[in-house]
Amino acid sequence: MVVWPMDRTCAWALPEQYAEFRQRATLVPAKVWDGSPTWLVSRYEHVRALLVDPRVTVDPTRQPRLSEADGDGDGFRSMLMLDPPEHTRLRRMFISAFSVRQVETMRPEIEKIVDGILDRLLALEPPVDILTHLALPMSTQVICHLLGVPYEDREFFQERSELASRPNDDRSMPALIELVEYLDGLVRTKTAHPDTGLLGTAVTERLLKGEITHQELVNNAVLLLAAGHETSANQVTLSVLTLLRHPETAAELREQPELMPNAVDELLRYHSIADGLRRAATADIVLGDHTIRAGDGLIILLSSANHDGNTFGAEATFDIHRPARHHVAFGYGPHQCLGQNLARLEMEVTLGKLFRRVPALRLAQEPDALRVRQGSPIFGIDELLVEW
């Protein structure tokens, strides 16, 4: 029987078993660390069906646990851990800040941020790590600008966010507690002295009007800050790797920048860094030739769904001309990633400027030597050394 989670050993290829899962059955039986059974969901049509099914819950007390250290967050609840209607109420309070129109107003600021980072990067002696010197500073500056979080605190919250995302690490809960305490203090400061950032606006328009509690705002500020910089940084780094492994595509994007939006969606589909979403059934669900029983755990394999040949054709290849907008890299349904429009814009601006300004960019290490992150639900690599 399959044991979950499964380690990934390649920076660009999925585990070979994923293709086998899609071919074998509607659902694949698996077990977690303590032997508890769960189901792996690997096919595109089934992933989408379950992510919109009201009989599937995100309640962390009912989901499969991935280690002895993996608890229910000790009462911590962001909107990502709540079912409707509570999830719906909270999401509506933040959704307008992440609309396509609102995010587009951030383009000049993001372009300014990326240009400044590239100026500093190009002043360094190569080889240079793309994650440390481009992707992470970019995503962190952007989310700090949006939320109104002091950028000078970045080392503190970057380290805690990374640790808090690791469900099998004993340091995860202490890191989460420190993040909550940090955002609690920041929200209290903004309550006394409101500003125009997203958190300050939420204080003025939501908290002080009684539409959201202090703790609800703090918990969702933790979510927005942590998810807002870590995921984008990893996705940008992997995207740079992929374009360097496909120099003809990088050249095509330099010559035809109008192709970048579709290239971004293909990169999202190709990598699908947020994999293995955990869910549980609250009632019996018939899916294909299987019946999921009430109480059964579910592991939703987004990356497998995004490589389903029945939906995407030659699923293992990277092709920026592929219609890829319907991928599920951001999830699907009511809990689909709130910041997807911002993530797309960050990728579009960062990748476009990087490959236009540094056309001679190349890898400074063997691809097979790249160190893949383990033990985290957010896939990535530890560093990406480049030269020019």
UniProtKB/Swiss-Prot annotation:
Cofactor(s) the record lists: heme
InterPro entries: Cyt_P450, Cyt_P450_B, Cyt_P450_CS, Cyt_P450_sf
EC number: 1.14.-.-
Record-listed heme binding positions: H87, R91, R279, H335, C337
GO BP field: antibiotic biosynthetic process
Metabolic or biological pathway: Antibiotic biosynthesis; mycinamicin biosynthesis
Keyword Nucleus tagged: no
A Pfam family of this chain: p450
Record keyword Metal-binding present: yes
A single GO molecular function term of this UniProt record: iron ion binding
Disruption phenotype: Cells lacking this gene accumulate protomycinolide IV and mycinamicin VIII.
Keyword line: Antibiotic biosynthesis, Heme, Iron, Metal-binding, Monooxygenase, NADP, Oxidoreductase
Similarity field: Belongs to the cytochrome P450 family.
Role description: Involved in the biosynthesis of mycinamicin, a 16-membered macrolide antibiotic. Catalyzes hydroxylation at the C21 methyl group of mycinamicin VIII, the earliest macrolide form in the postpolyketide synthase tailoring pathway, leading to mycinamicin VII. Uses ferredoxin MycCII in electron transfer for catalysis.
Protein's recorded name: Mycinamicin VIII C21 methyl hydroxylase
Taxonomic source organism: Micromonospora griseorubida
